[in-house]
Amino acid sequence: MAEEITDSPAPWVADHIRRFVETGGNPRPGTNDLLLTTRGRRSGKLRRTALVYATDADRYVVAASNAGADRNPAWYLNLVADPDVTVQVGALSRPARAYPAPAAERSRLWQLMITTMPSYQDYQNTTTREIPLVIIEPSGAHARRRDRPMTSGRR
């Protein structure tokens, strides 16, 4: 039996997750949305949230904006404690590793994120903390790209 996943306690996020699941991963056409499942750092339970993402090569980038609040979101604290996550983009769900973006990449990735969703700059302007950026690398993405292209059907 699959382990139970608890959706975000924020009603608007839980509603967004529900729409994401119901539409097969396309709740807001024209917007890059993904579902991120982390393991609760205290509870050990699986926790799921919906986030806007940008792509950087074969990686996804998300902002731990918490809508400009002065504290990091719980999902960010969870992945710092345990970087093994599940990411769902569209109908495809797969294991991944998630980690805070290194300082050397931050400026470039921040520009990518505010191009994707300009309101992130407004969020940054309303808080005293630096909004963390998170890189999500699907498991096997690098090996698949280097070794051979994905194909459909039998090998």
Question: How would you describe each model-predicted region?
Answer:
Residues 1-11, 38-40, 84-93:
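N-terminal short leaders/motifs
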Residues 25-28, 121-125:
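Residue-level signal for secondary-structure boundary elements
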Residues 29-31, 46, 80, 129:
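Short, solvent-exposed coil/turn segments
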Residues 31-67:
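Short beta-strand segments
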Residues 66-120, 126-132, 138-140:
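Short, structured beta-strand-loop surface elements
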Residues 21-23, 48-49, 121:
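A generic local structural motif
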Residues 1-32, 142, 146-149, 155:
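Extreme N-terminal tail/first-helix region
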